[in-house]
A protein has these predicted regions:
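Beta-propeller folds
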Residues: 17-175
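Sec-dependent N-terminal signal peptides
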Residues: 4-13
Length: 175
């Protein structure tokens, strides 16, 4: 019983000694938020990762934490690798629609050839996704589904019945 009382007193004293004032300013300013790295992607080789930085998308080694090279130069808001990591979808610009949805302008860079292709002729799209073979990218414009063949640049419309706040093809929505 004596040990329990001493332990309880110790915990109370430690709590008082290390107490911090919690304020709304600290909560909303991110004071208590953990530090992290945004825009990081682990590469399939298991030895490297990519990070978005001011100079572009930079490749680093896990083992040495040293820069291995720059995959794409320039400023981008975000990026996504194709499944085989042969291409990168680069988000250049965004325009919010609702709380979690946005329109964006995207380019696709072929990492082997260095060729850059603008998605949808440089116009805004939603939800772009690579095909499994990275030969095409599907996307949504005005609630209709499209895909673009990356080799030819040809854009094919899949649906035609999209309608704002009514028929929303290719985008998840609240019911």
């Amino acid at each position: 019983m004596k040990k329990l009382l001493i332990s309880a007193c110790f915990l109370v004293m430690a709590n008082i000694a290390f107490a911090q004032e919690i304020t709304l300013d600290k909560i909303y300013s991110g004071y208590y938020r953990g530090k992290g790295i945004s825009g990081i992607a682990s590469l399939k080789d298991g030895e490297n990762y990519a990070v978005i930085e001011r100079e572009g998308i930079v490749k680093y080694s896990y083992k040495t934490t040293q820069k291995v090279g720059t995959l794409v130069e320039g400023g981008f808001e975000s990026y996504t690798f194709s499944d085989d990591e042969s291409k990168i979808l680069l988000q250049k610009e965004s325009e919010p629609i609702y709380r979690h949805s946005f329109l964006g302008k995207f380019d696709v860079k072929d990492l082997k050839s260095g060729k850059i292709i603008s998605l949808n002729n440089g116009n805004f799209v939603q939800e772009p996704k690579f095909s499994p073979d990275a030969a095409k990218v599907a996307f949504v414009v005005d609630n209709n589904l499209y895909y673009q063949d990356l080799a030819s640049g040809k854009i094919t419309q899949i649906t035609t019945d999209g309608k704002k706040n009514s028929i929303i093809n290719g985008i998840g929505d609240w019911v």
